Curated annotation (Swiss-Prot):
Gene Ontology CC annotations of this record: cytoplasm; ribosome
Protein family: Belongs to the RimM family.
InterPro entries per record: PRC_barrel-like_sf, PRC_RimM, RimM, RimM_N, RimM_N_sf, Transl_B-barrel_sf
Intrachain S-S bonds: none
Species of origin: Exiguobacterium sp. (strain ATCC BAA-1283 / AT1b)
The protein, known as: Ribosome maturation factor RimM
SUPFAM superfamilies to which the protein is assigned, alphabetical: PRC-barrel domain, Translation proteins
Any one GO molecular-function label of the UniProt entry: ribosome binding
Main location: cytoplasm
Highest rank taxon of the organism: Bacteria
GO biological process: ribosomal small subunit biogenesis; rRNA processing
Keyword rRNA processing (UniProt): yes
Length: 172
């Protein structure tokens, strides 16, 4: 079975079993909805967890799980990763992509590979920002906007970027 990583339990929140999830998923409001099932990776074994409450909080997503109604029951899971079955992702419109399809793609500028998309983070209401890991240089932050990201080929794991002048500083 294929698994899709959706986040990790960063910490507990309060005394009633609520946890802070650092999301690594598209559409966290949909992914962490009440009644949804996530799978916690406990020493290589996937433990099924059903969400009983969800609310966004700052950069985290606060969730409680069925059967874990106090801090003592859930605290041992801090730092563990959460997954969903890969077949539980829905089809997207043309020119929309899941994070897992973009992360790991080579970033190409003027025909030259400059690095690999290592992470994606959301901004409040604006475009996503891609983190390009560049060997021997600082990471480049690339806004996911049409004028910068020219081409995406998820099958070839390749994205073509035309950076705005000054966006990529090679003087590291």
């Amino acid at each position: 079975m294929d698994w899709l990583y959706v986040g990790k339990i960063a910490n507990t929140h309060g005394l009633k079993g609520e946890v802070k999830i650092l999301a690594a998923t598209d559409f966290p409001e949909e992914r962490f909805k009440k009644g949804n099932t996530l799978f916690l990776d406990v020493d290589g074994t996937k433990q099924e967890m059903t969400i009983t409450t969800y609310r966004p909080h700052k950069q985290f997503h606060l969730v409680t799980f069925k059967g874990f109604d106090n801090i003592n029951l859930i605290e041992k899971y801090k730092g563990l990763k959460l997954y969903v079955h890969a077949e539980h992702v829905h089809d997207l419109d043309e020119h929309e992509f899941y994070y897992h399809e973009i992360i790991g793609c080579e970033a190409v500028v003027d025909g030259e590979v400059i690095g690999v998309v290592d992470d994606i983070f959301e901004t409040n209401g604006a475009n996503d920002v891609w983190v390009i890991k560049r060997p021997g240089k600082s990471d480049a932050l690339i806004p996911y906007i049409e004028s910068v990201v020219q081409e995406i080929d998820v099958d070839a794991k390749r994205v073509v970027i035309t950076p705005i002048p000054g966006m990529i500083d090679d003087e590291d």
